[in-house]
Amino acid sequence: MCGKASSHGLSWSEVYAWAATLRAPKTLPADPASRRNISPSRLRRKAEPDSMVWETLPVIRATDDCDQPDDAIWPFIPPYSEGRLPHNKQGRLISTANARLRDDGAPFAPTFMGAWRANMRVLVAVSWFYEFDRRVRPQIPYAVFPLDAPCWLMAGIGRFTRMPDDSRKLTVAIITVAPNDVLTGVGHHRSP
């Protein structure tokens, strides 16, 4: 998955009517904002930490009473990076928008294992996601729509983080696997 998605026209009532096994809350919140080009949170200007643009994705997380719709900051913020995008030891940003499911050993990279062990799994609800054919220049974007559903419900892994304003926010990474034939056909190596 390339890291771009859409919540255009997403309706919680349609999602819960379609996914009948979800336990809807007594009152649904307002539908997610209709956005066509959501990408992971980023700094507008690398030299200015205050230029942070926090992006969110609509998610559904299990609570004791129901499967609750929510907004989650994208990408996942690991424990060692509380309230800010993660960096490596050299100070470069680390991409945590996607959690790659591994074929052997631990299911995910160590960054995601604490959330996995804590059972912080969510469903990420999007109208469509984008894939770019990286085999050609300029890259060609493809919007990948579900044919028989109101949205994609993608597996995600979440974690609550403390933000700079001292609030607690849910953050999310989309779980990716090897692509199916359709996504392989557009030149991509991972799939939600």
Describe the residue ranges of each PLM region.
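Short linear sequence motif anchored by a di-proline
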Residues: M1-P192
